[in-house]
């Protein structure tokens, strides 16, 4: 179980790092600029250089901040993000544990991450961080209500909150054909949830103050930075599980469960 946990964390971290590089490449293409092109072949190892810089950078704790909670909040947020992937979203066997109420479990973890964001701004003792933390937390919690109502309707149709039930229900007919217009609204809400353009309300690229992470740097800033991309990747997987046939398309790769604990 310990080995599987370590492998899972490494695989997810590498996927998230690749997503960060892909997003930067796409943004540079849209904005007609070069983008990352120095480290590795055409900049493909840029995420390794960024990670090395962040992990070797020192951490300064503000004099008025609570040192314990200042360090604990990003650590808790990082733990919440990794806990997402211990659920059975990979497949029936490729998970550390399986719970009957997978959708509820994911929603609770998402709400907990929003609380971490709010408390992060509060314990920084910076008025800009406090305002940004409240703004981000209120936005995330309000969106969770909408997502909860939407997924509740879908779960009533499937008569279960389990990812396995969604896989069985969609063996013949995908739910995307029933909830196409609803999915378009969900995608807009997900953009709001993960603070992606044009809904980057909690933190805009044009602002000098980086929201609730204003006082953070180095390793602790990297945890929040990865947390946003964890949400982005997890919500993408969640949409695939709920609307696009679950893990039925991954059946050729399910032989890997023989090599897991």
UniProtKB/Swiss-Prot annotation:
Name of the protein described by the UniProt record: NADH-ubiquinone oxidoreductase chain 1
Alphabetic keyword roster: Electron transport, Membrane, Mitochondrion, Mitochondrion inner membrane, NAD, Respiratory chain, Translocase, Transmembrane, Transmembrane helix, Transport, Ubiquinone
Primary role: Core subunit of the mitochondrial membrane respiratory chain NADH dehydrogenase (Complex I) that is believed to belong to the minimal assembly required for catalysis. Complex I functions in the transfer of electrons from NADH to the respiratory chain. The immediate electron acceptor for the enzyme is believed to be ubiquinone.
Family to which this protein belongs: Belongs to the complex I subunit 1 family.
Reaction equation(s) it catalyzes: a ubiquinone + NADH + 5 H(+)(in) = a ubiquinol + NAD(+) + 4 H(+)(out)
Transferase as UniProt keyword: no
Membrane protein topology class: Multi-pass membrane protein
Listed EC numbers: 7.1.1.2
Localisation: Mitochondrion inner membrane
GO terms under cellular component: mitochondrial inner membrane
InterPro entries, A to Z: NADH_UbQ_OxRdtase_su1/FPO, NADH_UbQ_OxRdtase_su1_CS
Coiled coil: none
GO molecular function ontology, one term from the record: NADH dehydrogenase (ubiquinone) activity
Membrane spanning residue stretches: 2-22, 69-89, 103-123, 138-158, 172-192, 224-244
Domain of life, per lineage: Eukaryota
Native source organism of the sequence: Paramecium tetraurelia
């Amino acid at each position: 179980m310990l080995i599987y946990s370590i492998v899972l964390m490494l695989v997810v971290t590498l996927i998230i790092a690749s997503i960060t590089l892909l997003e930067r490449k796409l943004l540079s293409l849209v904005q007609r600029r070069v983008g990352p092109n120095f480290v590795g072949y055409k900049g493909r190892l840029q995420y390794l250089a960024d990670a090395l810089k962040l992990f070797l950078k020192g951490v300064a704790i503000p004099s008025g901040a609570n040192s314990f909670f200042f360090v604990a909040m990003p650590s808790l947020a990082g733990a919440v993000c990794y806990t997402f992937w211990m659920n059975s979203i990979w497949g029936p066997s490729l998970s550390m544990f399986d719970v009957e109420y997978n959708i509820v479990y994911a929603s609770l973890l998402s709400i907990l991450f929003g609380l971490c964001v709010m408390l992060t701004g509060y314990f920084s003792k910076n008025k800009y961080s406090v305002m940004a933390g409240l703004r981000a937390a209120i936005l995330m919690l309000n969106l969770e209500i909408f997502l909860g109502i939407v997924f509740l309707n879908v779960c009533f149709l499937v008569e279960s909150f389990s990812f396995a039930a969604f896989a069985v229900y969609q063996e013949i007919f995908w739910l995307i054909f029933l909830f196409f217009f609803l999915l378009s609204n969900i995608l807009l809400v997900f953009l709001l949830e993960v603070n992606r353009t044009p809904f980057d309300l909690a933190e805009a690229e044009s602002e000098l103050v980086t929201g609730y992470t204003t006082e953070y740097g180095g390793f602790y800033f990297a945890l929040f930075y990865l947390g946003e991309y964890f949400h982005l990747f997890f919500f993408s997987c969640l949409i695939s599980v709920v609307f696009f046939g679950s893990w039925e398309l991954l059946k050729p790769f399910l032989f890997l469960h023989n090599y897991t604990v």
